[in-house]
């Protein structure tokens, strides 16, 4: 995974545009009734960025570990929430956490940058660090977004593309069935949202570890 992209290009731009305080309109709130979000839990915000969802879970009394590949994003997060535990992590490598460490692993638009082999390994790692009965909650880009990106991507493997030096995976239901086969589905919804004034075609999901 390209560490330089996230430090030099992505967060260089979006640190100026994102709002860490805006936590009440986050999509996960619509599913609070399904995951007992007010019960104190050990949460991993995997691919946390600057930490909007970290703050969301902290505000509800959870113990949160925030992990990202970007040193710049983690420095910003630590400056704004000094008490949070941060771990720099490349998700194409084994996760730096203990077996059965977390009640919730949360990954907002952060696991769709990997090849089939890397994605398979990542989901196995997420299952490893989740407690039995723990929740894997997140979102990924949908294959319905292909029409918006087809003119500037090169296909590397099925549903996996290079976009100007950055890899991106687009997900459909079959991929959830394959990669998440050892998890129990609670929620799987395809949605269209607006992000930074652009249309975002994505899946929202909640799965439960066995």
Residue ranges of predicted features:
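A short acidic, Gly/Pro-enriched loop at the edge of an enzyme's catalytic core
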Residues: 95-105
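A short His-aromatic
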Residues: 112-114
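Class I (Rossmann-like) S-adenosyl-L-methionine-dependent methyltransferase catalytic domain
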Residues: 1-39, 49-94, 137-209
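Conserved catalytic-core motifs of eukaryotic protein kinase domains, centered on the activation segment
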Residues: 116-117, 149
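A short beta-strand submotif of the Rossmann-like class I SAM-dependent methyltransferase core
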Residues: 107-110
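Class I SAM-dependent methyltransferase core
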Residues: 45
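A short glycine-rich, Lys/Arg-flanked "PGG" loop and its adjoining helix->strand segment in the class I
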Residues: 120-132
């Amino acid at each position: 995974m390209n560490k330089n992209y996230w430090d030099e290009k992505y967060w260089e731009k979006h640190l100026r545009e994102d709002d860490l305080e805006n936590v009440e309109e986050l999509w996960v709130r619509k599913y609070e009734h399904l995951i007992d979000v007010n019960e104190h839990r050990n949460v991993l915000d995997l691919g946390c960025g600057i930490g909007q969802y970290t703050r969301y879970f902290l505000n509800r009394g959870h113990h949160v570990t925030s992990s990202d590949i970007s040193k710049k994003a983690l420095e910003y997060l630590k400056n704004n929430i000094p008490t949070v535990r941060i771990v720099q992590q490349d998700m194409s490598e084994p996760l730096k956490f203990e077996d059965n460490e977390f009640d919730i692993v949360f990954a907002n638009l952060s696991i769709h940058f990997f090849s089939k082999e890397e994605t398979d390994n990542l989901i196995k790692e997420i299952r490893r660090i989740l407690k039995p009965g723990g929740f894997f909650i997140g979102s990924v880009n949908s294959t319905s977004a292909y029409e918006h990106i087809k003119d500037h991507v090169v296909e590397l493997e099925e549903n996996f593309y290079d976009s100007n030096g950055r890899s991106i995976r687009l997900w459909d239901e079959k991929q959830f069935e394959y990669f998440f086969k050892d998890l129990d589905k609670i929620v799987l919804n395809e949605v269209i949202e607006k992000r930074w004034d652009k249309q975002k075609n994505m899946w929202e999901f909640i799965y439960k570890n066995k």
